[in-house]
Design a protein with these regions (language model features):
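N-terminal small-residue-enriched
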Residues: 1-459
């Protein structure tokens, strides 16, 4: 990518200017996407990106810059400019760089470069045809394939030198159905950390059926009457609520700024004993997994909440230093254009022992939120608002009619203790998460669970 001699000179220059830590992040990536809309390939895109990010730490203060120009003189100048912003300390020398091996647990079986564009187009057409076969009220189908190959090199003044390759593959399918009272959209978006084999093994019929039937059911649905009520939250992407409303406030990026309701709560009970939550970056082939984080640390499994007790935060180098905890291998960034901060990887509520039937039977009137859509959250307060993509009324302990227009509104810190029943049907779902270090692949997940009371927005 760039010469090791150049990297060493950058590290030396940063420390000579008084920084106590200098880091170099080099990235070379390429991505492509194929998009089918209304039975036609309407967009094919590809891009390449190369650049270098340089970070200097002066105590707890970080200064970051980047360049797409690998010229040595340019990078030395950039390092010097960054150093001018810091509070200079004594000059030191970096440790000698020693290349470290990376254990790759994410095998790529089919190199995307060996696959023809025609094969990709044919797969998208199969998704379109399969989705439309589930009903004439399907008005529109959008199918998209995303592939990305990312190579990174990370070096720092403590002697670290490590390289890693990351291949991503994701399918996004949306179906729009309409039966009179406005269109309804449903989507499925599986993805992996892996190669083109993901697309050759994908279950076209299942994914198409799930999206089409969800859209068709909601097209027939009436509106729910809002209010505070018990909710059974479906597995898989239902975990987006924990991710957004509780996961972000557990990142040291929020904790160190005293911008989280979980500040100072380690060792305290924050949920009922049935709940254990985990962030695990080591699950093979999972969309949010990593061999190493974007500071070069091996990925880890971190128990966030165990039997209702808050056990850990998610930390990067700066966060771990300020919060006085070990690093959890959670430093992430979208690209070389962003400094790394603590971020989630594969974050999920673990399996419990309750059954779906028992959850439904325990409710006289409530909502079964089978599939969640998008929403928003304030990490400082944990306040969230999420749309329900597919929902059903619960009446007298049974699932009743489909309902549309429902939203779940609350505060993560307050909702956690109201989770009283957790099933044993854990599923994980791929997503993209945006924060101060850009958009990164993350996985959310949970078993089906019951929230005793939450505000449901409706009509």
């Amino acid at each position: 990518m760039i010469k090791h001699e150049t990297i060493t000179k950058i590290l030396e220059h940063g420390l000579s200017k008084g920084a106590d830590f200098t880091e170099v992040f080099v990235e070379d990536s390429k991505s492509s996407s194929f998009n089918l809309l209304d039975r036609k390939i309407d967009q094919i895109q590809s891009s390449n990106s190369f650049g270098i990010g340089i970070r200097l730490l002066f105590g707890d203060e970080a200064y970051y810059g980047y360049s797409s120009d690998p010229n040595e003189a340019n990078l030395i100048k950039l390092t010097g400019n960054l150093a001018e912003s810091g509070k200079s300390g004594p000059s030191t020398d970096p440790e000698t760089l020693e290349k470290q091996s990376v254990q790759d647990i994410h095998h790529v079986a089919v190199n995307p470069a060996t696959v023809s564009d025609q094969e990709r187009v044919e797969l998208l057409r199969k998704f379109d045809e399969s989705t439309r076969s589930h009903g004439g009220d399907i008005q529109q189908v959008n199918a998209n394939m995303l592939e990305k190959q990312r190579s990174v090199l990370i070096a720092n003044s403590e002697g670290l030198l490590v390289e890693d390759s990351r291949d991503y593959a994701r399918m996004r399918l949306s179906a729009i159905a309409e039966k009179g009272d406005g269109p309804q959209t449903a989507a499925e978006s599986p993805g992996v950390l892996g190669g083109y084999e993901f697309f050759r093994e994908i279950d076209v019929e299942k994914i198409s059926k799930d999206a089409a039937q969800s859209a068709l059911r909601m097209a027939d649905a009436g509106y729910i009457e809002g209010g505070v009520m018990p909710v059974v939250l479906g597995n898989g992407f239902g975990g987006v609520i924990f991710h957004e409303a509780c996961g972000h406030p557990l990142e040291t990026e929020a904790i160190r700024k005293n911008a989280s309701p979980f500040c100072g709560k380690l060792g305290e009970k924050v949920a009922q004993p049935v709940l254990t939550a985990i962030d695990d970056g080591t699950i093979a082939q999972r969309w949010g997994s990593l061999n190493i984080d974007d500071e070069g640390m091996p990925s880890k499994r971190t128990v966030l909440i165990e039997n209702g007790v808050l056990k850990s935060y998610l930390s990067d180098r700066i966060g771990a230093r300020q919060v006085e905890m070990e690093r959890t291998g959670s430093a992430r960034r979208e690209s070389y254009k962003f400094a790394p901060v603590s971020r989630m990887r594969n974050t999920f509520i673990d399996n419990g022992n309750d059954t779906f039937d028992d959850m439904i039977a325990s409710i006289d009137f409530g909502l079964y939120a089978k599939k969640m859509g998008g929403g928003s959250v304030n990490p400082a307060t944990g306040e969230f608002n999420f749309a329900v993509q597919e929902g059903y009324a619960i009446r007298n302990g049974k699932i009743a009619e489909p309902v549309r227009g429902a939203t779940l509104i609350g505060k993560g810190f307050e909702v956690l203790p109201r989770i009283s029943m957790i099933g044993n049907d854990l599923e994980l779902a791929a997503g993209m998460c945006g924060a101060s270090s850009g958009w990164v692949p993350t996985t959310v997940g949970q078993p089906t669970l019951k929230i005793d009371s939450i505000l449901v927005g409706g009509r």
